[in-house]
UniProtKB/Swiss-Prot annotation:
GO cellular component: cytosol
Cofactor(s) in the UniProt record: Zn(2+)
Positions annotated to bind ATP: K249
Motif ('KMSKS' region): 246-250
GO biological process, one term: cysteinyl-tRNA aminoacylation
Xref: InterPro entries: Cys-tRNA-ligase, Cys-tRNA-synt_Ia_DALR, Cys-tRNA/MSH_ligase, Rossmann-like_a/b/a_fold, tRNA-synt_1_cat_dom, tRNAsynth_Ia_anticodon-bd
Taxonomic superkingdom: Bacteria
Protein name as annotated: Cysteine--tRNA ligase
Amino acid sequence: MYVCGPTVYDTAHIGNARSIVVYDVLFQLLKFCYGKATYVRNITDIDDKIINAANEKDSSIESISTYYTRAFHEDMRSINCVEPTHEPKAAENIKYIIELIEYLLQSGHAYESNKHIYFSIESYPEYGALSGKKIDELEHGSRVEVGENKKHPGDFVLWKPANDTDYKLSSYWNSPWGEGRPGWHIECSAMSYAYLGKDFDIHGGGIDLQFPHHENEIAQNKSAFAGSMFAKYWVHNGSLTVNKEKMSKSLFNIVKVRDLLDSGIKGEVIRYALFKTHYRKPLDWTESVISESQETLNKFYRLLRGIDVASIEKSDVEVSRDFIETLKNDLNIPEALAILHEMATKINKTNNENEKLKLTESFIKSARFIGLLESSYQEWFTAGISYQEIKRLIDLRKVAKQNKDYDAADKIRDQLKQMGVTISDNEDGTTTW
């Protein structure tokens, strides 16, 4: 499986995160079903946006891309995403990029014009099959570079000559066509070829990449390698809006994963919120989505009280079969979450302790299959809260009760509850939490 990864010029926003968590779950499912799966997710570290960021900050593209790649990894770990099998960078695969361009030139699908190498979309009769676009209907300048030296306005650049900014930032490489750098589309084509070969099973990415990026990848790879299927299946996750508006700098509504984490929202809450709608459908990000996700996870974690979660992996209890079958049905994560809710209800209604334990173990394993319930009860409800602070408040409440100041005692109980700490008064006068 090949998935288009981030362009590392800034920290990840929730739109980026949605794509990552979708293919993270798909990767787990593929491994479960087939025993082994190879997941390649690239890092785009050669791009105009990175060059602009480096120029603005008087830095180098290597410094910018290294910094934001590290930030991306930290953010994705925070929302419980596993690392892919391979994570190639464009700058480390120039050899394969040049090789692929040479194949396209030799086969007549690419041409040189004014020191640029372009792909000729008219040379590939199936162009537009993925997106439903037709060559004669393509608008001039539709997310492809337009220039006077193209044979068709939809032709896109494979290699561009270095300019003054490229020389200043060392963002250029030697090639048979002179010093320059690759176009965006050829980078992914070359990296999927380098790590998965001419043909592989699944290609994923956001719906915004379907055209022109994925359409262009297909044209490049199938033109370079006669008879190639390239990717057998294409998977696209839906778009994400914020309060029903498209995320954009002009609207000042870009929601960064890092900002959410810094505001005290747990990574697992962010992950759950990104699962709220089917992966192919649009997702609208709102405050209520976050609060509902927090409440649901609090409810789930209360079922873990007294459970030794460290021993769960050793248990012979399996992930719910219904849960797995639901995920197999077009990765229906919202329906899988509904099954978790059903399991939680059964656990609460069951009086038989052995049955309750088995149900809880299956519940935890099922949730962990999609990256949820990775903490213990204690860790979840005391994250960011010190043991000393909890003890101090419990002691204050005890004093308030002794002084018959029950209003103060109730306020402290409510304060602890808001912190996620549930307390229970025992017959011997002690309090557990």
